[in-house]
Design a protein with these regions (language model features):
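Catalytic cores of carbohydrate-active enzymes
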Residues: 22-42, 60-61, 98-100, 173-176, ...
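Sec-dependent signal peptide recognition
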Residues: 2-7
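Long, intrinsically disordered, low-complexity segments
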Residues: 425-430
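C-terminal motif of bacterial Sec signal peptides marking the signal peptidase cleavage site
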Residues: 14-15
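Long, repeat-rich segments with strong aromatic
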Residues: 248-253, 298-306, 315, 319, ...
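Solvent-exposed loop and edge beta-strand segments that line ligand/cofactor-binding
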Residues: 48-67, 73-75, 120-133, 206-223, ...
């Protein structure tokens, strides 16, 4: 037999032998981590104070609530969590669309074109129409609520004449009827920076306008895939309807959005031209957040996940950022977005967001990359203690920005720590 064959066998046996030692060492690190307990306690402290996104926001946002509802379940009774979800259903649009967030009607005044509903007179709603993730976020939130509390009675609750179960499907129908592109078989939205809600063509950028350049991206479609999986688990009798849709979106994400040569997702498929200069090569940009959500949607193989985290680590090194929560690398150049906050490495254009970095950590743990997850978790939990809070985002120099009680960050880090503790428990039982 070939000598290389025996070398390969020996290497494989060595890897198998070292795995228990590696796991044992990691378990010790998890159990003695100097930041985990502080972060857990701080997360519970922050989430007790309410449901708005953070101290810089008056609204309860569904894309945020989706990432801390499980944490909220630790400190609030079921009916409180359920009531927040019911507000979104009572304010559902006549076409099935879901609002971004709601605020007490008497406090409405933040520049939005507010939405009102006879079913929910207490609140004013708003919707950033450049996004295509509100409906998916609500389905995921209801799923997490049921998983966390065991209370599936919410599915039979009524908002007006429709049950929650009916409204969940209606929200998915909205996406297929109003945000689905037939040519590519994928959902569309405005051009934004990865998962962001700011388009380049407007000073604020949260609404579709006559200048909008419509595009397809991985984040919106990966969120939809996760929502469809959740919906079919909540409503198994509807699986026959939604399974083919899920399969179509999954296949088309791989076909049209995955760049096999460069082992990354392309930023956008443009439906009516790009808002950026003709000589700009947008595919040089690597989207961290959309990639993390795509992994959650099951779109990448183990080898592709490994390549993804290696690329993210390299991007952090090249940019000088603090963590793999870096939204993208490189960022869009100066002046590409009319919103002045979207300067290179500013806000969603290359800011460092634990809110998405924490989701990548979760997926690394779930996909057997616990060692890498632990390594990349450290800067995120360290800065919580260093800054005594969960900040919305960080500059490339690791300086905290935005809300200091950003509940989405608290939620994803808390959940990641739960997964590390589960990993330790399961390995101790082996």
């Amino acid at each position: 037999m070939n000598k290389l064959f025996f070398i390969g066998i020996a290497a494989g046996l060595l890897a198998c032998a070292s795995q228990p030692d590696q796991n044992e060492n990691l378990m010790k690190q998890i159990q003695t981590n100097e930041y985990f307990e502080f972060v857990k306690e701080k997360a519970l402290e922050v989430v007790k104070t309410g449901f708005n996104a953070g101290d810089g926001y008056g609204e309860v946002w569904i894309r945020d609530y989706n990432t801390f509802i499980e944490l909220s379940a630790e400190v609030f009774e079921n009916h409180v969590l359920k009531e927040n979800l019911m507000v979104f259903f009572r304010m559902q649009g006549d076409d099935g669309n879901i609002i971004d967030g709601f605020i007490p009607a008497e406090k409405a005044g933040g520049g939005y074109d507010y939405i009102y509903s006879e079913l929910e007179p207490r609140y004013a709603g708003h919707k950033n129409t450049v996004e295509t993730d509100q409906e998916s976020s609500l389905v995921q939130s209801v799923y997490k609520y049921v998983q966390a509390t065991g209370d599936n009675s919410i599915l039979n609750e009524k908002a007006g004449e429709k049950t929650v179960a009916e409204r969940l499907e209606w929200s998915m129908d909205f996406l297929m009827n109003h945000r689905h592109n037939e040519q590519y078989g994928l959902l569309w939205g405005a051009t934004t920076a990865d998962w962001g809600d700011v388009q380049p063509e407007h000073d604020w950028g949260v609404y579709l306008t006559d200048d909008t350049h419509y595009a397809i991206d991985i984040y919106d479609n990966a969120m939809f895939l996760i929502a469809l999986e959740n919906l079919m688990e909540l409503l198994p009798e509807q699986k026959e309807k939604w399974q083919p849709v899920h399969q179509q979106i999954f296949n088309n994400c791989r076909k049209h959005l995955w760049d096999e040569t460069n082992q990354k997702f392309i930023p956008h498929i443009y439906l009516d031209g790009s808002p950026f200069p003709d000589d700009f090569n947008e595919n040089e940009i690597y989207y961290h957040g959309g990639t993390a959500v795509a992994i959650e949607a099951g779109l990448l193989s183990k080898n592709e996940i490994k390549t993804s985290v290696e690329k993210m680590a390299e991007n952090v090194k090249l940019s000088g950022a603090g963590s793999i929560g870096l939204t993208m690398y490189p960022p869009y150049p100066e002046g590409f977005f009319k919103n002045e906050g979207m300067y290179p490495y500013g806000y969603q254009n290359g800011g460092d967001w634990t809110w998405f970095g924490g989701r990548m950590i979760q997926q690394l743990i779930k996909n057997d990359f616990a060692v890498e997850a632990y390594e990349h978790m450290q800067p995120m939990v360290k800065r919580v203690k260093d800054n005594d809070g969960f900040f919305e985002w960080y500059t490339v120099n690791n300086e905290p920005k935005g809300s200091g009680t950003f509940r989405g960050s608290a939620g994803v880090l808390w959940k990641a720590i739960q997964l590390f503790e589960k990993f330790t428990k399961e390995n101790n039982q082996q």
